[in-house]
Amino acid sequence: MKFLSFAILAASTVDGFVPGVSTLPKIVERVALNGIARPNLERTSKPFNEAEQNVQAIKEKPRPSEPKKVIVIGGGLAGLSTAKHLVDAGHIPIVLEARDLLGGKVAAWRDEDGDVTETGLHVFFGAYPNAMKLFKELDIEDRLQWKDHAMIFAKPGSKKREFSTFDFPAGLPAPINAGVAILANTDLLTWPEKIKLGIGLIPAYLFGQSYVEEQEGVTVKEWMRARGVPDRVTDEVFIAMSKALNFIDPDTLSMQCVLIALNRFLQETDGSKIALLDGSATERLCEPMKEYIESKGGIVRTNVPVQQIITHTEGKDKDSVAGLLLKGNEVVSADYYVSAMPVDAIKKLTPDSWRDKEYFSKMMGLKGVPVINIHIWFDRKLSTIDNLIFSRSKLLSVYADMSVACDGYSSSKGSMLEMVFAPAKGWIGKPDEDILQATMEELEILFPEEIRADGSMAKVEKFTCVKTATSVYETLPGCEAMRPTQISPIPNFIMAGDFSKQKYLASMEGAILSGQLAATAVQDLDFERSSSNFQLPAKLSERPFDSSVDFANEVTPDRQLYRVRVAESLPKEVEAELKTMDNYASVA
């Protein structure tokens, strides 16, 4: 009986991603709700309380006798998080961002009309404890717009405002809230399919994290078939989930990724509750992070791409970082260096002398996944709702009507649909107009009474298409062993970024946590070394920017991520100084 009860609970819990039918009256009630309260994470989320303790521990550790200068390469969430926690630890971070705006993969900018274009449709979950703690630390929690606790799926070809949905009842803990919400729903999966899937997932619940980690080497589809779960379950449920998690299909995504997400969402009462930022992530999140860092003595610079990591070639400091060459032949140096760049960028900048080291050679197997983010401004309001919607579309992952869901983009005139186009591998090189046409064809299926691909119904007033050729790292089977730890074999070089080792995989939460871990690594290494005879590697003299150098005045357009331009050689005076330093160290 106990086993049967567990199987039923597992089936109903997994089916938390498989909603029932919701029609117009219920949706109207949902849209009317405003000002949904922040969930009480202090009460419902053990990970949130752990995140609070970890941040407090950084602040309470002994202050350095001499604050160290730490250069952080990259002004996305990982880099800004690193710098935020470094100033909390009493050090002096200098953030170097290649573009002229902060945010990296969450960057956003305004066009000539004042409308915002985002790199991606970014949502925050209750199961993002470190992100939630960051908002609390910055005193900007009111900028998160929480939505009704529901997971909503489109029903392609259906009438206006008809969705597959399930609501998590308030007042019940996880996973009971998911089970209660789902048991009555039979919209997408039959009971035999639910039970088959539930039985397949029992080991994950019985053996926990150890079992989850063991599934890293198989794809979602392989895992399902090995357990006799029908392909229809994968098609109806896990295509949408896989595309939302990593922008790829279940025949390539590692099952570990799905199991980690399920555990995070279903072990925390408010884990799957969604919030959207009330505007541009660059303005509403990254700028407050910058202000916090600078108010405590840190520095944040933009439009300063790194072109070479300069390393010592001889002596006791061999292979350690001597400084960085920036555009315009500017040279900067520090006590420690943290890379918070995307994985494809640090792969390009990795010095030749490091590439044979196992730490870096493994990392070379990681790669970013392509994704496209689309904004379409329509001439009228569409039948949408105030929440994120899983599209269940061939080409679209998720979408939201930002004129309804986001205060910063609200409009009473027309809808602005923001959509994630994924998988994008076959589309990333195509013209924007072709991508728009394909998107409109998908929207005609999702909004059959309101949109026609030929534009004969709702009219497109304008659109933007943001292509990111290498976004978050592609979570393929076998890639977990390639992910680098924060501490590297180079004594003054630390790694951050969502691809580095941390438990939240490729996500905003993962990026923020990686920054905290990188800052902690600097703090702990420096404290250990302060009580020993360890000497930090010698530093190159800093040199000013020279505007006459090739590409010195080049600026990356807003809609593009910076593509690393590796310097072919060092300026002669820098090369001479480095040679003198290394020769002296060899003799000494």
Protein language model features and the residues they cover:
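Glycine-rich FAD pyrophosphate-binding loop
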Residues: 87-112
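Mobile amphipathic helical/loop "lid" adjacent to a hydrophobic cofactor/ligand pocket
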Residues: 131-132, 136-137, 141-259, 267
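Helical element adjacent to the flavin cofactor pocket in flavoenzyme catalytic cores
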Residues: 259-336, 340
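Mid-domain catalytic core of redox enzymes
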Residues: 66, 89, 304-447, 562-565, ...
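FAD-binding beta-loop-beta segment adjacent to the flavin cofactor pocket
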Residues: 406-411, 467-495, 499-502
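A conserved FAD-binding loop/helix module that cradles the flavin
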Residues: 501-522
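N-terminal Rossmann-like FAD-binding beta1-loop-alpha1 element of flavoenzymes
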Residues: 67-95
